[in-house]
Amino acid sequence: MLVLHIGPHKTATTYIQNNLFRGRRDLARRGWLYPEIGAGGLPGHHDLAHNDARYIEDGTEQAAALNAVAKKAREKGQNIIFSAEGFCRWSPAQFDAFARVMETDMIDLVHVMRDPFDLFYSHWGEEVKQGHSSSLPDRFAEHFNDPLASRRLNPMVDLARLSRQDNLRLHAVPYEVLRARKIDIYTHIGTEVLGLPDLEVSNIKAKNVSFPIEMTEFLRAVTLLHGDGARRLPDGSAMRLRFTRMLRHEDRKKITTLMKTAGRPARRKIRIPANPSYMRRLTKTLMRGMEGCWTIPFEEDELFPMPEEKTFIHYDTYLMMKTPEIVQAAQGFLDRMTVSEL
């Protein structure tokens, strides 16, 4: 059996990958290989997912090494599991090429379904950390004009084409159902997909801890100043790493206080009414599209329950960048980052 856990982002992927990585010896004893190849020393196989041509094109050194891993696993009677969020962006042709390298007729894909509003908010925060400067309302407008056509808001945009592949078998994990029932997502995947009940969970603190909204918006202000208003910085990820390395505990406290006080006039809320029609349509689309693929039985209204209004905080870009205290602090932090780079 060959399994790819494909995310997507912000669906407990780091937690799952850390547990797979920490538990790889126990997995090996129970017939499952979590390979080092394609990981680049990280818990997840991000190099394989994002630089796939090096691994799945005929004649490359990495393709030969990957094929050797597959052959050795078969000789030992082992199954294989890989994990990376980037796999969710692969095309059917990429999965076909990967299957050829691994010499398998079937790949099992594990996809986690999370509430699309919460997922969107988390993903926007991650975008800011990667050098994007777009405001939350701007990103909402881009995707919510036609939510069922959005890859971000409707997983079936990607999964529909994958479900038609004869060599791909989908396993849909309902994130909100597991959370409501207090079921650990790692042990659930172990039991329902890998056939390994009672997997040991490592209580590992995630390294990519999410910023509070005040830190996210302050970083966006730094990005806007650094990029002179550009929508995205090519070195955004590197800048975020410098930002977090320099961020002391007292900096966090000062920035949070600054944004809550001086930035109060720029603070805004996006309100989503309870049980919006989009969510009902999406639920029906997913229930039909993933019929027979769910890893646990549940009622339709459990998939994305939304009995109450959702509220998402953000800061108005114009008002934020017209607040002298915020601009001064952001420029000061940017100057510190620039000096540290020299």
Regions found by a protein language model. Give the residues of each.
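Anion-recognition interface
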Residues: 1-342
